[in-house]
């Protein structure tokens, strides 16, 4: 029986732009990437990254894979949105300020009963959500 999500990988159109977005917002530590200057004979070990990066986001991993030329659409089969957990409402307030500071449009904080959500999109239009419980 499964006990949690190990990792999620998002396909993106531009790895540099996506890295700047996710690292600028979340400052997650990089868990796995091919080191700069890796000799060609050793690069095959990193083939599973497909030129991307994997971040440690707490108890799970989130990867970015630069292969897509399509745009995200939650109305097609596949991913609807990615929701990331925060500890409480104060972190959500800080997130609003950070999104505003970086000029990232968002839907404002919404009360959904058991907590609050903040919805926004990444540069590839992937729907993202931050969730904060009412009681930390």
What kind of feature is each model-predicted range?
Residues 12-22, 81, 107, 117, ...:
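Secondary-structure boundary/capping motif
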